[in-house]
């Protein structure tokens, strides 16, 4: 339920040092983007502006002018995010190319 609450509260992305497996899976399944990047978490402070590219895994701290590398999302996860969740992704046929 935590990813649902965060998404409903308007949080656009969570970057953390690590996630419990259940939180990670639930987040992806509802189309809530999360990334693991210890260095970005250590440097980020309140009111820092961050920019994330999920296709490359690049996290930019605009405030500090620094870049960090997290693991990029594979295409099927990007499709889940674009469709705002796994259920919508299946309904829209967006995973068909990965199911063959």
Swiss-Prot record:
Task: Please name every pair of cysteines joined by a disulfide bond in this record.
Answer: none
- Keywords of this entry: Amino-acid biosynthesis, Branched-chain amino acid biosynthesis, Leucine biosynthesis, Lyase
Which pathway does it operate in?
Amino-acid biosynthesis; L-leucine biosynthesis; L-leucine from 3-methyl-2-oxobutanoate: step 2/4
* An example molecular function term from Gene Ontology annotations: 3-isopropylmalate dehydratase activity
Q: Which InterPro entries match?
A: Aconitase/3IPM_dehydase_swvl (IPR015928), AconitaseA/IPMdHydase_ssu_swvl (IPR000573), LeuD (IPR050075)
Enzyme class name: lyase
Q: Give the coiled coil ranges.
A: none
What is known about its subunit structure?
Heterodimer of LeuC and LeuD.
Q: What is its EC number?
A: 4.2.1.33
Q: What does this protein do?
A: Catalyzes the isomerization between 2-isopropylmalate and 3-isopropylmalate, via the formation of 2-isopropylmaleate.
Top-level lineage group: Bacteria
Q: In its UniProt record, which GO terms are filed under biological process?
A: L-leucine biosynthetic process
Its recorded name reads 3-isopropylmalate dehydratase small subunit
Q: Which reaction does it catalyse?
A: (2R,3S)-3-isopropylmalate = (2S)-2-isopropylmalate
What the record says about family reads:
Belongs to the LeuD family. LeuD type 2 subfamily.
